[in-house]
UniProtKB/Swiss-Prot annotation:
Annotated [4Fe-4S] cluster binding sites: C91, C97, C100, C179
Entries under Gene3D superfamilies matching the protein: 2.40.50.1070, Nucleic acid-binding proteins, Vaccinia Virus protein VP39
EC number: 2.1.1.190
Protein name: 23S rRNA (uracil(1939)-C(5))-methyltransferase RlmD
Species whose genome carries this gene: Cupriavidus pinatubonensis (strain JMP 134 / LMG 1197) (Cupriavidus necator (strain JMP 134))
Amino acid sequence: MPAAPRAASASPAAVAPGSDPVVSIDSLDMEARGVGRLVNEDGTPGKVIFVEGALPGETVSYKSFRRKPSYEQAHLLEVRRESVMRVKPGCKHFGVCGGCSMQHLDSRAQLAIKQRVLEDNLWHLSKVRPEVMFRPIAGPDWGYRYRARLTVRYVAKKGGVLVGFHERKSSYVADMTSCEILPPHISAMLVPLRELVTGLSIRDRMPQIELAVGHEVTALVLRILEPLTDADKDLLRAFADQHNVQFWLQPKGPDTVVPFYPLDRELAYTLPEFGIRMPFKPTDFTQVNHHINRVLIGRALRLLDVQPQDRLLDLFCGIGNFTLPLATQGRSVMGIEGSEALTTRALANAGYNGLAEKTEFACRNLFEVTAEDIAALGRFDRWLIDPPREGALAVCKALGELSQQGSDVLPQRIVYVSCSPATLARDAGLLVHEAGYRLAGAGVVNMFPHTSHVESIAVFERR
């Protein structure tokens, strides 16, 4: 029979029958939960305990809500010994709202933990270590989220509408009156939005509001399951005039999104360092954090070390977020994107910014690309890869095959921007172990402060 586990921070007699169990927290997992391990009576390692809200260095009591043979998931009851990294959360809804998971952790410690997550993934998944760890890219901790999807829920018992993020690990909508990670003007609009939707005839047929903040325009996309009445339209127009926003309507899928009022506005963000303005639709993919996006572009271009004669390739190019800045520095750039709508937008943005002659765009499924497809593109001096969470597996496999064939189309340098340390690690393993690259450097990009999301950037150099 296996020995019964006891708390790692206490002797067997220290935990009296019926009292709350105690554990020492050693680390955080990918969901920002504290991780500790119990010790069996015979001194052997026991179960791993995941405690929501606990921090490394703390001793906490907990209550388990899910028990498995090798681990337990638990709620935090009391902090017996507090970490020096613990701070007071900046939002009154923290702990209930699921939008943030790390507000109780000092911002510098957040960066250090994310950097460790990146390093651990690279080593444990692919046995790769960067030659240099870059200083984290960081910016303002509050008011940074310029894109968000808010859930709308009519609650008859409460006599009104809730507008906000989901509660933590729940389908319920948090009763939010403000949000510190949204821009201040959006945070101040949450209560008026609730009042607006409550007054609409379709208040129980509007499940979602998607917001996108541009340089001059704030767009609100209303997901409507029934047509608006004339009275509804009057309310929306009045609200738009009062709060200086633009309403868009989405009756069905994302392709059905159309502007409603006012119609004389253009949603766009700017990249002033490059003299670029990027018009976009509110449902297009754009980075949520404008400040970090600008810093990230600058670092990516410096790491690529673009020369005036270089021919450049931008994979998963979206609306041209990296493509157009690259075009201001290299001889020419080809952008490839899997979405036809985004490819069309990128082409239009190149023309809008006077860069059409230096850019070329194509719509391709990069998740199914082959070595033959890559070879057919010809040689580019430098690549930028910015895939979604799924990563760039097919692309990196193709590079490995081409390397083993002795092909001369492989670029000298690749900068890889990632929103998943696990898929970056997987792809880095292919580039290093099969395609003949070395991982010259990597670092985290704090695109989402106070969340466990880890964005990163890495540079690969051909050996």
